[in-house]
Amino acid sequence: MADSLDRLYQAVLAARDLDPATSRTARLFQRGSGKMAKKLAEEAIEVVIDAVNGNREAVIRESADLLYNLTVLWASAGVRPEDVWAEMRRRENLLGIAEKLPKSRIGKPAAPHATRRPVIPQEARAVRKHR
């Protein structure tokens, strides 16, 4: 599956600069991350509704749409599939592949992407009071 998502990611990158009049992907990039997030949320809700209704075939179709929209949002945010796979490996090493990390952090966070600002824990931030 990772190969399929990697190919999809590359196709999304290739399509982002196409004509928005003919490319759904280019149109999403033109409209921005807010529209991308809305489409992702819509697809997630459709997957949930179809799953609750027991419609297996619709869950499969809507899941493909969900993964497409997630991949578009990743590309917009500068997140590569391998970044996500690295985080999944880290979590698997901590808790096993089938577990979600608790909200309190366990272990080191994933290494930040080279172009991002470093994450500074809240407790390490100095608070300045203006007089």
UniProtKB/Swiss-Prot annotation:
Organism annotation: Rhodopseudomonas palustris (strain ATCC BAA-98 / CGA009)
Chain segments carrying region Disordered: 105-131
Pathway the protein takes part in: Amino-acid biosynthesis; L-histidine biosynthesis; L-histidine from 5-phospho-alpha-D-ribose 1-diphosphate: step 2/9
Entry keywords, A to Z: Amino-acid biosynthesis, ATP-binding, Cytoplasm, Histidine biosynthesis, Hydrolase, Nucleotide-binding
NCBIfam families attached to this UniProt entry: histidine_hisI (TIGR03188)
Subcellular location as annotated: Cytoplasm
Protein name per Swiss-Prot or TrEMBL: Phosphoribosyl-ATP pyrophosphatase 2
Reaction equations catalysed: 1-(5-phospho-beta-D-ribosyl)-ATP + H2O = 1-(5-phospho-beta-D-ribosyl)-5'-AMP + diphosphate + H(+)
Record lineage: Bacteria, Pseudomonadati, Pseudomonadota, Alphaproteobacteria, Hyphomicrobiales
Family classification: Belongs to the PRA-PH family.
Entry's EC annotation: 3.6.1.31
Main localization, broad class: cytoplasm
